[in-house]
């Protein structure tokens, strides 16, 4: 997902925000996309693949935290304590990502959104110490902070704001589906004998591939 998104999203996309004045100077019209038009745009599906990684991986990890704890032989309160790292880093990233979006634009940040989550799956795959729980959920929190801001601003930048309500409704529905998918997928993989390391590998492969 990351390499494909990198090559496609930072190219010649006309923005409806900071670049509007430049476009107006050249007498170019900014297109306001309707939802049906968005559904016909291949870039939309590539961006969705990037944005939906966080919901299904994080939800699966939250729901099956007892399985993760037993597999890693962590104490009963380790993951609960790790949520502090998740929450703190999520909030910090929310503020930082807002500044970065204003400076660089959402489309340029989107390609980096899942990198912390990718490193988190690597940590979960290779390390068993209790500290790795804090690192994993902390990295998930960083991606969560980025995703919460980019999940709104990206669509407005690329597809305009006139029909942003219907577009955002569509992407929110897909996000909800993604969380349900993550829970089902984690459960299925556990039932057929996958270890948490195997699941981390599958998750990391999805992000990178």
Across the structure, where does each feature detected by a protein language model lie?
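Intracellular juxtamembrane helix-capping segments at the cytosolic ends
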Residues: 146-159
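Helix-to-loop junctions at the C-terminal end of transmembrane segments
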Residues: 93-105, 190-191
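A membrane-interface helix-boundary motif in multi-pass transporters
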Residues: 1, 188-207
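Helix-loop junctions at membrane interfaces in 12-TM secondary transporters
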Residues: 126-136
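C-terminal membrane-cytosol helix-exit motif in multi-pass small-molecule transporters
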Residues: 1-24, 209
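A late C-terminal transmembrane helix in Major Facilitator Superfamily
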Residues: 158-193
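Structural signature of the two symmetry-related core transmembrane helices
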Residues: 108-123
């Amino acid at each position: 997902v990351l390499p494909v998104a990198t090559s496609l999203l930072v190219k010649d996309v006309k923005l409806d925000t900071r670049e509007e004045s430049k476009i107006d100077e050249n007498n170019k019209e900014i297109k306001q996309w309707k939802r049906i038009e968005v559904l016909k745009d291949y870039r939309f599906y590539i961006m969705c693949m990037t944005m939906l990684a966080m919901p299904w991986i994080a939800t699966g990890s939250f729901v099956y935290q007892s399985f993760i704890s037993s597999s890693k032989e962590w104490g009963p309160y380790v993951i609960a304590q790790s949520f502090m790292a998740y929450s703190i880093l999520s909030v910090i990233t929310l503020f930082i990502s807002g500044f970065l979006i204003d400076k660089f634009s959402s489309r340029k940040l989107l390609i980096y959104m899942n990198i912390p989550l990718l490193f988190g799956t690597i940590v979960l795959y290779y390390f068993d110490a209790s500290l790795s729980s804090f690192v994993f959920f902390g990295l998930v929190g960083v991606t969560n902070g980025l995703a919460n801001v980019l999940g709104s601003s990206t669509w407005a930048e690329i597809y305009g704001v006139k029909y942003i309500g219907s577009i955002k409704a569509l992407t929110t529905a897909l996000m909800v589906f993604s969380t349900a998918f993550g829970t089902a997928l984690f459960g299925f993989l556990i039932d057929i004998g996958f270890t948490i390391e195997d699941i981390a590998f599958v998750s990391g492969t999805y992000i990178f591939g």
